[in-house]
Structures are given as structure tokens and as C-alpha cells.
Amino acid sequence: VYNTAVGYDAGSRITTGVQNTFIGGLSGDANTTGNNNVSVGKSSFSANTTGSSGTAVGAFALLANTTGANNTAIGNSSLAANTTASHNTAVGLGALGANTTGTRNTAVGANALDASTTANYNSAFGTHAGSSITTGSLNSVFGDYALAATTTGASNSAFGQSALGQNTTGHSNTAVGQNCLYGNTQGLRNTALGLNAGAGVTNGDNNTMIGEAAGNHSVATTVGNQNTLIGSQTRCDAYNSNTTVAIGYDVAGTGGYTTLGNAGSDIRALHGNITWATVSDERYKKDIVDSTAGLSFINAL
């Protein structure tokens, strides 16, 4: 039946399971009908009974798995609590270590997603990436300690070391850059791009901050909503400003106004409905030439 077992009690209860490889003391000890499993390490896959197509490499990897299928655990204690969940991938010490029934998660890095229990469709790459997520789903995390404090927050995307690092329940946020939106805890639908962009936001919603330290100056936007800040060190002039638009370098915008310019130069602040006019004036044109078409040309039309 093409089973291989090496180690004390390894694969000792196989009845009809085929094409299994169990190496290590108690490896695959409870397996009865599970097929196509590979387990290397002490007590790895030791509770599995009918789960199939699993790979466990490392002491206690997939330790509690019983019927879960198509799981891959590489690293000591990775996916150790998994019981019936399927289609999970964990690479690194303790990665997805608390997962029980959550499915289709990918964790790469020591302790990545290690608190996740029933969450689904999370991807985390980096040491402690998403390490506090318990039930939050549909998160994408790339970077050491990115989204590290999130528990139930969902649909967040964090790219960069410590991006969204203190987020707990906030959802639908996007942070690209080291420390981006780092201080956000409960804010929703914020977007930050650039080193330290939006790092001071805590509970603000629907903010867009693009540029190094945008929204994170001496007066950081913390609870303001619907602000758009574009340019390095652009910011609001109050921590609770709303509907601010600031575009430029090191410029502070005021709630309800559109502010354009750079520090040390002319800055223009616009307010209310703005009408743009297209002028037709010789003063604003160049490369003017005479028209050779006269009345005869017009009469011929």
C-alpha cells in the first residue's frame, strides 16, 4: 500500500490509508484512512485520522489535525491546533499555530497569523505579520509586524514593515510603505502610500494620504474624515479636520478648502464650488499665425 513509517509508533494505526510517509516518533500516530500525507518530525500530524494530502515538516506541525485536508505546515508547531480546516499553508515557527477551522490562509514567517483561529482567506508574509488576527478575514499582509495588532479587522492590505501595525478592528484600509497608517486602530477605508504616510491616523475614515509623512506632521490627522493629502509632509491644520484637500510639499490644508502650493512659495486656498474658465486671449497664446483663408474660402463651404 506504499506507506512508509520510521520512528516510535509512527503510522501505527493505518488501516486502509495509502501512500503516506511518516517519519519521527508518533508521527502520523492516529492516521487510519488518510492518504497521500507526508509528515516529518516528532508528533507531527499525530492526531490525523482521515485527513489527506497534508504535508507536515517540523516537531508538532499539524499536531491536532484530524480530518483537515490539503494543508501544508513547515516549521515547528506550525498549524499545530488545526483540526478540520483545509487548504492552509504555514511556513515558519508557529505560523498559523492557533488555527482550528479557518480555511485558505497562507502564512509565511515566524509567528505569522499565529493567533488566527477561524479566520479565512488571509495572506501574511513576514515575522509576526498579522500575528494577532483571530477572526478577521480577507487581509493581505506583507512585512515584519505589519497588521500585527489586528484582531477582527477585515479586508485590510498592509505592505511594509509595521504598516497598519496598531490596527485592531479597522477594516478596508490600504497601507503601502513602512509605518504607513501605523497608529490606525479603528479607522475605515483609509489609503496611505509612502514612508510614514498617515501614521498618526487613529480613528479617521475615508482619508487618502500619498507621499512621505503625508498626514503625519506636527499636527497629525488623527480622527478627521474624508481628507485628501498629496505630497511629502502635506497635512491638515487640525487633528480633526474634515474634507481637506492639500496638494504640494510641506503644505497645511484647512478643512473644507483645497490648498495648492509648496512651503515657502505662493499657496492658494480655494473654497466652495470652483468654476474653471478657458480663456481666449492673445496674452495667453503663442505661435499665432495669420489665416490665409479669406471670404472666398468661407463662401465655398
Language model segments and positions:
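Glycine- and small/polar-enriched repetitive beta-structure motifs of secreted/surface proteins
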Residues: V1-S280
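Intramolecular chaperone/auto-protease modules of tailspike-like proteins
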Residues: V279-L301
